[in-house]
Amino acid sequence: MRPVASFRPPPTFSALQGGASSQATKTAGIDQRGTNQAFSLLDPQSTQSNSTDSSFGEMGNLLMNQVKGVNSMQNQADSMVHSMLTGGDVNEAEVLTSVQKADLAFRMLMQIRNKLMDAYREIQQVQI
């Protein structure tokens, strides 16, 4: 009889934020700061609402702040790529990391949007 491989549960949200990094990420050289920055976009306490518009609501302001954060990350990545392509003094690893951070943040934002749209459609189908 073959021995059963030990079960390793998936990492928790705090572990993904950098609380407990795995050996694989250490050996792969993944920048934990970029992951933390991308996951901080999902943390409602990390964003502050500058607007007090009650018609849009706190959730709407939170989402707008997240969109603005992702947009700024993408703009930063674009400017770094442009600087690298035009011969600027930019480290290639920093450019790649910046592009990957922006990509991860955008993908997470799209997943949030998809979940919100699914919830909205489900609410629409509720019989009154």
UniProtKB/Swiss-Prot annotation:
GO terms for biological process, alphabetical: bacterial-type flagellum assembly; bacterial-type flagellum-dependent cell motility
PANTHER family from the UniProt entry: FLAGELLAR HOOK-BASAL BODY COMPLEX PROTEIN FLIE, PTHR34653
GO cellular component, one term: bacterial-type flagellum basal body
Lyase keyword on record: no
Organism in which the protein naturally occurs: Rhodopirellula baltica (strain DSM 10527 / NCIMB 13988 / SH1)
Listed transmembrane segments: none
Polar residues bias (residue ranges): 33-55
Region (Disordered): 1-60
Signal peptide range: none
Keyword annotations of the record: Bacterial flagellum
Protein family per UniProt: Belongs to the FliE family.
Main location: other
Superkingdom, taxonomy of origin: Bacteria
Cellular location(s): Bacterial flagellum basal body
Pfam family of the protein (one): FliE
Gene from which this protein is expressed: fliE
Protein name stated in the entry: Flagellar hook-basal body complex protein FliE
A GO MF label: cytoskeletal motor activity
